[in-house]
């Protein structure tokens, strides 16, 4: 999974 997606969720 892309880290960018996780950061955007926060």
Curated annotation (Swiss-Prot):
It is found in: Secreted. It comes from the Eukaryota. The keyword Secreted applies. Its main location: secreted. The keyword Transferase does not apply. The modification Arginine amide is found at residue 10. This is Tachykinin-related peptide 9. Keywords: Amidation, Neuropeptide, Secreted. GO terms for biological process: neuropeptide signaling pathway. Myoactive peptide. Increases the amplitude and frequency of spontaneous contractions and tonus of hindgut muscle. It holds the Pfam family Lem_TRP. Brain. GO terms for cellular component: extracellular region.
